Regions:
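Protein kinase-like catalytic core scaffold
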Residues: 54, 102, 114-118
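Short, surface-exposed charged micro-motifs
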Residues: 42-44, 103-107
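Activation-loop N-terminal segment of eukaryotic-like protein kinases
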Residues: 109-111
Length: 196
């Protein structure tokens, strides 16, 4: 359950300093290579039971202190990354034989190498902007897939940027007046937590 937003992660410059870290080794751990990150993107894909797909365009995610700051579409990536990320997301959904909406997050390094960072078999926070950017949101597509409803071709109807409102910032947004092309979605969490 750790590993998101930088939780449970420790930078290790040498294997010699593993003993100095506050890690419960009985629970196991993973050592990962540090990627010289250029950017992160998400591919949201919906796989239907007839093995057909609807794939949203790549979404670019920008983080601050390892927490999502905002997501935007279209992502600023080259055609090679566009094709490869969509292909890999499709292959992952197919190998899992997954029905529904799935997110595959990718890291892009400074040499334009692509790495799978996360596979989330569900609707995903980076895809919430599909509500206003597409004719069919990730949520509706998920329901369509799992309930075997008609598949409708995706059409992007607007560029979009989604700001991740965390902690007590929520009170500012709850009282803000929004322009015609701005939308606010409040999950009405009972407890406001710092950095969540």
């Amino acid at each position: 359950t750790l590993g998101y937003d930088g939780k449970g992660q420790y930078p290790v410059k040498s294997l010699k300093n593993l003993d100095s870290l506050d890690i419960d080794y009985s629970k196991g751990f993973i050592l990962e290579k540090v990627v010289k990150l250029k950017k992160e993107i998400s591919i949201i894909i919906t796989r239907f039971s007839d093995q057909k797909y609807e794939i949203y365009e790549p979404i670019e995610n920008v983080h601050e202190n390892q927490i999502l700051k905002y997501s935007k579409i279209p992502a600023e990536i080259n055609d090679k990354i566009l094709r490869q990320s969509k292909l890999w997301a499709t292959q992952i959904a197919e190998e899992l034989k997954y029905v529904g909406t799935l997110c595959v997050e990718f890291f892009i390094d400074r040499n334009d190498n692509l790495y799978v960072n996360e596979i989330a078999p569900r609707v995903h926070n980076s895809g919430h902007l599909t509500i206003n950017a597409y004719n069919i949101s990730q949520f509706e597509n998920h329901v369509r897939a799992v309930c075997q409803l008609e598949q409708i071709s995706l059409e992007r109807i607007a560029d979009a940027k989604m700001i991740n409102v965390i902690g007590d910032q929520i009170t500012i947004y709850r009282n803000k007046k929004f322009e015609n092309n701005e939308f606010f979605f409040d999950y009405l969490k009972k407890e406001i937590k710092s950095k969540r």
